[in-house]
Amino acid sequence: MKTSVYKSAQKKEHFRAVYNSFLHAMPFQTCTLETPYGETFLLEAGEPSNPVVLLLHGSCTNSAFWFNDIMALMGSYHVFAADIPGEAGNSSEFRLNLESADYADWLLCVLDALGLPRVSLAGNSLGGWMALKFATAHPARVEKLMLFASGGLAPIRADFLERAQAAEAAEESLSFDEDVAGGEHLPQEILDFINLILESYDPISVPLPVFSPGMLRKLTMPVLYVAGEADDL
């Protein structure tokens, strides 16, 4: 039996109501696709005649966190931002198997449903891992690959994982200002939304599989990697 990532049906309902209130204020189109891996929710912006870029968010976030990036890109690109299944968004509430080809197969289904033979992919943290998973499996479908503090290139730092697991056990949350945003102050509205996410669902609590050098050699497209000096991931 599949297990929802949400802590209760009530928490899921409340979280999604708040999330959708944010989305309604954004000048983007939305769509929901049916796939063999459940529903996939996407934001869409920009002219269909423009080059396509698909954005994949990190853990404990969703497509709304790409707002500023979509606003900057939509004048030159046809932008899609997908809520990853098993994360805190409007897509399927069931997490896929990280050790299998499930997430690569899911994204292939999404691109096929959208009629997109080839796209540029951009991923942050967990989303970077998803982008790598797809790009190593289907390099011919990826025009360019952009990774921001991506998982999957090295083991996650043990001290960060220990703090996250301790916070989860104590039903607390990490300080996003200090532990995730590198000390940069985040607006209270965003912090409240992040805390609502952490109160509503169970994030991935195991290290992401690391891609071997042999797998990374399958990347035939141009790759941009951006990371912070003190990045925990």
Language model segments and positions:
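Active-site loop/oxyanion-hole signature of alpha/beta-hydrolase fold enzymes
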Residues: 81-122
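Alpha/beta-hydrolase fold catalytic core
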Residues: 1-51, 76-77, 117
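Conserved HGGG/HGGXW glycine-rich cap/lid loop of the alpha/beta-hydrolase fold
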Residues: 38-89
